[in-house]
Amino acid sequence: MYARLIAEKLLNHKLTIATAESVTGGLLSSSLTDIAGASRFFKGAIVAYSNELKKSLLNVKQSTLINHGAVSRYCVREMALGLMQKLNVDIAVACSGVAGPDALENQAVGSLFFCVIVANKAYDFETKLPAGSRNELRQLFVQKILQTVEHILSEIS
């Protein structure tokens, strides 16, 4: 539902979007490309599951990973900024989190960090969803991100 609303807003305003994903492993971009006509608003995705790819493809600083970890608001902000630079889009969405089964970097299972950059403004989000199965959490993460992106687009349009 949210992906369709996002698509309508992007198409109406002739905006483009891209995603940089870690914890969702491509599910976020898949949700957007499920919409017919996605090629008119969706530029692409970088699934940077490893820290090496976060650094090399998205320009995440080594110091950020050491000081704050990959599952942090600092990392997803740098991922979103790197995505904007690499893919030259109007809207960049980046996410990282913990889907389990174990905690990671002192973050509990269900922790989600994401950043949305639109109109040169960055919106940072941190949430904790109830623990569930790994795949349930990843789906919930995607829904939370899409809901938030749709809300941001509603506010600015």
From Swiss-Prot:
<dbReference type="InterPro" id="IPR036653">
    <property type="entry name" value="CinA-like_C"/>
</dbReference>
<protein>
    <recommendedName>
        <fullName>Protein MG115 homolog</fullName>
    </recommendedName>
</protein>
<dbReference type="InterPro" id="IPR008136">
    <property type="entry name" value="CinA_C"/>
</dbReference>
<dbReference type="Pfam" id="PF02464">
    <property type="entry name" value="CinA"/>
</dbReference>
<comment type="similarity">
    <text>Belongs to the CinA family.</text>
</comment>
